[in-house]
Swiss-Prot record:
Segments traversing the membrane: none
Role, per record: Acts as an epigenetic regulator of myogenesis in cooperation with DPF3a (isoform 2 of DPF3/BAF45C). Associates with the BAF complex via its interaction with DPF3a and HDGFL2-DPF3a activate myogenic genes by increasing chromatin accessibility through recruitment of SMARCA4/BRG1/BAF190A (ATPase subunit of the BAF complex) to myogenic gene promoters. Promotes the repair of DNA double-strand breaks (DSBs) through the homologous recombination pathway by facilitating the recruitment of the DNA endonuclease RBBP8 to the DSBs.
Keyword Phosphoprotein carried by entry: yes
Keyword Ubl conjugation: yes
GO biological process, one term: positive regulation of double-strand break repair via homologous recombination
Covalent cross-link (Glycyl lysine isopeptide (Lys-Gly) (interchain with G-Cter in SUMO2)), residues: 550
Domain PWWP, residue spans: 7-64
Protein name: Hepatoma-derived growth factor-related protein 2
Species this protein is from: Rattus norvegicus
Phosphothreonine: residues carrying this PTM: 609
Pfam families (alphabetical): LEDGF, PWWP
Molecular function (Gene Ontology), one example: histone reader activity
Tissue: Expressed in the spinal cord (at protein level). Primarily restricted to neurons, astrocytes and oligodendrocytes and is particularly expressed in motor neurons of the anterior horn (at protein level). Significantly up-regulated in the injured spinal cord (at protein level).
């Protein structure tokens, strides 16, 4: 069951991102923001921040002292443990009722009041500022990461009453406000009192903490209207050193003090708002606040020492930042110097390369020894670069320029020595210099020849592989050689011979039927008998390759009796012309019945059309199509078993083919 708490109870409060913090259940001041239901206003010791938390996040101090009361690294936590034990009523927000004497005290001070009052108020301000510096330095450094989670955790400030006083006091005459703003500035600048010195010392570290913890600004709470009141209270405490009450009420968190002290020019605005805050509590006479005011005076020495130590830490941090900035500047300067040096070196190298190219162009053929001389120069330049890079980062640019000048001098000396060697070498060589110039020409010629041969070989290799291409090429050559206007017999004979040597398959002939047709036509080329004979020979070769070797043997055997059986063969030619398939003969009548071939009369061509059509039909069946289906399939069977009774018709067809070939040979002869 959650514990019921009362105002003034000491507890450990748990907020997101923070350990169980020593805190106190606070009173709700008149006019202050009321907490939501089931939540208590909490005052955190050490940091002096306020928040609204539920009972589940609150743990009694006495019961949980051993569990949560252990020292922690978080700055402000150990101070909170000390405060909850030694000063449980500590508070920056002074109670609202203040006596008239207290409210009139700041006005008396502005007009030059008693010295005793000034000293008392100065001591109070010292204690307040000391605690603020400790809180700011601790909370900003340790909780910079956890602040993002706790930005919206519900921290509030107890300064709404002071805001109302500002609105009431805003009607005061401008002359009084100007006097109030001028008097504290003059006191801070001219009076050498110890209280003012301490206030200045406390004010400077607050300014320095701004650079460290600008992120703490949103931690102050959800209401941004109260931030200027906190800044006014801090600057007022540092400038006047005489108004402790308004400073206490308006000091809600270290974040507000750090953000408010960022601008030193806000002193004038602070002085304008001082009198309204001093007079607002004058309406409420109860003298209770004095008892609480005396309590913060107990540990003034410790708070002042803490403020001094914090200011020293801030000074150290600022020194470290300055050193870091100086180092960064030095590094940037070194980088710039190195970049400039690299650019200079690159430019020098480019110039040297250009000079070397010019020298090489002038020298011409004799470049062997020059390359040998250039290699040590490159090595030296590389060594010089290796030496120059580490020294450039440490040495000044003037020393670097001096080193670069030395390098250039060395390079110029080396170039001078090379130029001095050249005339001696030329004198020694004399005429032999001309010979190496002539040699490259011969080498180039040999290279060109070898390249030409290699190209020819490549061309031959490309032509060799494809048989179809050669067949088509020879076909075109034969057609071109047997033109009517200018026939070239030798070229035609050579092409026919090459065509006979080609290893042609039946598939290739089926694709290229035009070749077979032209060979048939050339067999009747009467302008030259050699062409006719060669064409007939090539035609028979192709036919034998397609039909098989046994057909050739039968033809040779039957050649002897071909002359005797001419008459019978002519009669029999009509029968196979009717029986044999005439598909190819019908497909190619146009080729045989086309215009007369070279030197052949139309009448002669017409006489031979009937016989030629039959012969061509059978030949085409045998040649490109591999013969008729019956002949091709039955020929191996006939050779294996010629005595079979069913093969008489096939034997008769073979005899006819043999007789036809014999007749063709006789006609050609």
């Amino acid at each position: 069951m959650p514990h019921a708490f009362k105002p003034g109870d000491l507890v450990f409060a748990k907020m997101k991102g923070y350990p169980h913090w020593p805190a106190r259940i606070d009173d709700i001041a008149d006019g202050a923001v009321k907490p939501p239901p089931n939540k208590y206003p909490i005052f955190f010791f050490g940091t002096h921040e306020t928040a609204f938390l539920g009972p589940k996040d609150l743990f009694p101090y006495d019961k949980c002292k051993d569990k949560y009361g252990k020292p922690n690294k978080r700055k402000g936590f150990n101070e909170g443990l000390w405060e909850i034990q030694n000063n449980p009523h500590a508070s920056y927000s002074a109670p609202l009722p203040v006596s008239s004497s207290d409210s009139e005290a700041p006005e008396a001070d502005l007009g030059g009041g008693s010295d005793a009052d000034k000293e008392k108020e100065a001591r109070r301000v010292m204690t307040v500022t000391a605690v603020t510096t400790t809180a700011t330095s601790g909370r900003t450094e340790s909780d910079s990461d956890s602040d993002k989670n706790s930005d919206h955790s519900g921290l509030k400030r107890k300064t709404p009453v002071l805001k109302m006083s500002v609105s009431k006091r805003a009607r005061k005459a401008s002359s009084d406000l100007d006097q109030a703003s001028v008097s504290p500035s003059e006191e801070d600048s001219e009076s050498p009192s110890e209280s003012e010195k301490t206030s200045d010392q406390d004010f400077t570290p607050e300014k320095k903490t701004i650079a460290r913890a600008p992120r703490r600004a949103p931690l102050g709470g959800r209401k941004k209207k109260k931030v200027p009141s906190a800044s006014d209270s801090d600057s007022r405490a540092d400038s006047d050193g005489a108004k402790e009450e308004p400073v206490v009420t308006a000091q809600p968190s270290p974040s507000s003090s750090s953000s408010s002290s960022s601008s030193s020019a806000s002193d004038s605005d602070v002085s304008i708002k001082k009198p309204p805050r001093g007079r607002k509590p004058a309406e409420k006479p109860p003298p209770k606040p004095r008892g609480r005011r005396s309590k913060p005076e107990r540990p003034p020495s410790t708070s002042s020492s803490d403020s001094d130590s914090d200011s020293g830490e801030v000074d150290r941090i600022s020194e470290w930042k300055r050193r870091d900035e100086e180092r960064r500047r030095e590094l940037e300067a070194r980088r710039r110097r190195e970049q400039e040096e690299e650019l200079r070196r690159l430019r020098e190298q480019e110039r040297e390369e250009k000079e070397r190219r010019k020298e090489r162009a002038e020298r011409g053929g004799s470049s062997g020894e020059e390359l040998e001389d250039e290699e040590p120069v490159k090595k030296r330049s590389r060594k010089a670069r290796g030496r120059g890079t580490p020294s450039s980062s440490d040495s000044e640019p003037e020393g670097e320029l001096g080193k670069e000048g030395k390098k250039l001098a060395k390079k110029s000396q080396l170039q001078g020595s090379e130029s001095a060697r050249k005339p001696g070498q030329k004198e020694k060589r004399g005429r032999p210099d001309e010979k190496p110039r002539a040699r490259p020409v011969k080498v180039e010629r040999t290279r060109k020849r070898s390249e030409g041969l290699s190209l020819d070989r490549k061309g031959e290799k490309k032509k060799e592989p494809s048989v179809e291409e050669r067949l088509q090429k020879l076909h075109s050559e034969i057609k071109f050689a047997l033109k009517v206007d200018n026939p070239d017999v030798r070229r035609c004979l050579s092409a026919l011979e090459e065509l006979g040597t080609l290893q042609v398959t039946s598939q290739i002939l089926q694709k290229n039927t035009d070749v077979v047709a032209t060979l048939k036509k050339i067999r009747r080329y009467k302008a030259n008998k050699d062409v006719m004979a060669k064409a007939a020979e090539v035609y028979t070769r192709l036919k034998s390759r397609v039909l098989g070797p046994k057909v050739e043997a039968l033809q040779k055997v039957n050649k002897a009796g071909a002359e005797k059986e001419r008459a019978d063969g002519e009669k029999v030619e009509e029968q196979p012309g009717e029986q044999a398939p005439r598909e190819l003969a019908e497909d190619e009548p146009s080729t045989d019945r086309s215009a007369p071939v070279n030197g052949e009369a139309a009448s002669q061509k017409g006489e031979n059309t009937e016989d030629g059509a039959q012969e061509d039909g059978q030949d085409l069946e045998d040649g490109p199509r591999g013969g008729s289906s019956e002949e091709l399939h039955d020929s191996p069977q006939d050779s294996s078993d010629p005595a079979r009774p069913g093969n008489e018709h096939q034997d008769h067809e073979r005899m006819q083919l043999a007789s036809e070939s014999a007749d063709d040979d006789d006609e050609d002869s």
